[in-house]
UniProtKB/Swiss-Prot annotation:
UniProt cross-references to HAMAP family, sorted A to Z: MurB (MF_00037)
Active site: 170, 220, 290
Transmembrane intervals: none
Family the UniProt entry places it in: Belongs to the MurB family.
Biological role stated in the UniProt entry: Cell wall formation.
Listed pathway(s): Cell wall biogenesis; peptidoglycan biosynthesis
Disulfide linkage: none
UniProt keyword terms in alphabetical order: Cell cycle, Cell division, Cell shape, Cell wall biogenesis/degradation, Cytoplasm, FAD, Flavoprotein, NADP, Oxidoreductase, Peptidoglycan synthesis
Cofactors named for this entry: FAD
Name this protein carries in UniProt: UDP-N-acetylenolpyruvoylglucosamine reductase
Database matches in NCBIfam families: murB, PRK13905.1
Residue span, FAD-binding PCMH-type domain: 26-191
Amino acid sequence: MNNLQTKFPHIAIKLNEPLSKYTYTKTGGAADVFVMPKTIEEAQEVVAYCHQNKIPLTILGNGSNLIIKDGGIRGVILHLDLLQTIERNNTQIVAMSGAKLIDTAKFALNESLSGLEFACGIPGSIGGALHMNAGAYGGEISDVLEAATVLTQTGELKKLKRSELKAAYRFSTIAEKNYIVLDATFSLALEEKNLIQAKMDELTAAREAKQPLEYPSCGSVFKRPPGHFAGKLIQDSGLQGHIIGGAQVSLKHAGFIVNIGGATATDYMNLIAYVQQTVREKFDVELETEVKIIGEDK
């Protein structure tokens, strides 16, 4: 597997790369092989090679709603951060997988295109956002998603239309079929720039008031359970401020777990499990994680 550097001398590849550099929690072990393609063609080459040689392949986006275990990840990590182009086509925007959702929302603002205001504070990448149908403040990616270019796990290129991109709360066809997002097309609407800016300012202020942006975190840890709010259940369980190792249930928003210093992925996972157990015992409600947990234990 380490011969990938010889096989693909034109592609940026690192060995035993610490993944804590790439996650918002600042935790996680190392990747055996860390690949950073600069083009869709390079990504396609690596995916096809991994499939042909039965090498485990994991896709890494912006690392924002993710916990990578302390033992790291075996096989190949494909990091699509270098695929960042964003372009306008009439009232549509085409953004590549590695483009930040926040940057895409700002691009739309500058082009006087409305529809992505809800995304102005979501820290993920386009690829990650499509994978989990990211959303906030009443908006979701699926509301404006028109089409996507993806790779299958065999390296086959596919163009998916809106009708093929089924989505629900924190779910997508892309996740279900384990597709690798290369780009996304969003259908937006012309609007006065000052009105778009006002909406984004309003949402940014709400986010800054409610979320613990001053600490590393993995964002919203739990999905919203039917008929409840995860943060309220956690707060009512007396868990706000609870600490395990360097991980703490945020004092600002109980739905977040923050790294207050030196946290490990194991600290995060132990605290998540403790919160789930406590809420289950107190309210008979099962909290399902929204954050994705991958990798191996140390």
